[in-house]
Structure formats: structure tokens, C-alpha cells
Amino acid sequence: PIIIYNIPPRSVVDMNVDTMARLFELKNIIGVKDATGDLNRVNQQKKKMGPDFIQLSGEDGTALEFNIRGGVGCISVTANVAAKVCSEFQEASISKNNSNLMAEANEINEKLTPLHKSLFIESSPSPVKYAASLLKLCSDEVRLPLVKVTEETKKTIRSAMIHANLI
């Protein structure tokens, strides 16, 4: 199966809903990782392709609203350093008919929001590598042309990791 990755900020091309619909006619295309930032797309794509078109958020920061509107998950950057919490968040955020789980999703989202933001202050994957190094998962070394994050960014990431109860 193939998941289309629609990320206009990096590709400079936005695959519109009609293009998605045409691609979905192909046997192996099952859905999209949507990093457009346009939350209205979820409803538009669901209307055009139906419920079998898998819609995954490509942005941690908007994943809650994305899932509320009909998405079914997120291909997450933050999950690289907070897998368990992100998994709990996703499970709760797709449980629209359970007010307790939605409250839990909101609570987790508030806890993770500073981390989501901090992991994109500088070019990816340098911030994620630094966050992972705080968990002793790896070193913060990156290869050129990437560089390590600045001291200011390190402080922001560390603070966000503490806020999320990860360190």
C-alpha cells in the first residue's frame, strides 16, 4: 500500500482534492499523510473519496483537530521521543463519542504542544536528535549539511521535554 505525502511547505506543490481523488482510484494508494495545515481538507477529502481513504495528519500540532474532523491518526515527529504518550493521545483523539477520552486527548495535547513546537524551531531532524539524546536514545550528532541545534534551542527543547514529563 502507498500513502501519499502531501507537504507543500517542502515540495512547493499542493496536491489538491481532485488530484487526490484521481490517485485514490489506483489500487495501491490507500490514503494521505496530510501536512498542508489546511484542516478543511479533511472534510473535503472525506466527501470526495469516502471513509475508506485513510487520512493521517502530518503535523503533530494540528493532529487533534485533524482527527476530530475525520482523520484517523498521525505520522508523528514527536512520537520519536514520546511514543507512548503520542500513542495514548492518538487513541484518545479518535474516540469522538467518548467525552472522557476526548478530555484526555485535550489534556495530553496541552502537555505535548510545547514539544511539538520546539521540534521545529530548527531544521529537522536536528531538534529530534537532540531530544532523543536527552533520553539517551542516541547522540545529538548530525551529518552535514545539517548542524546541531543552538544552545537556545536546546534550552527550549529541554523545557518542553520537562513540561511533557519525559525527563
Where are the model-predicted features located?
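A generic "binding-loop/recognition-motif" signal
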Residues: 38, 59-62
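Short, well-ordered helical secondary-structure segments
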Residues: 2, 19, 56, 115, ...
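Glycine- and other small-residue-rich loops at beta-strand/loop junctions that grip anionic moieties
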Residues: 5, 9-12, 33-35, 56, ...
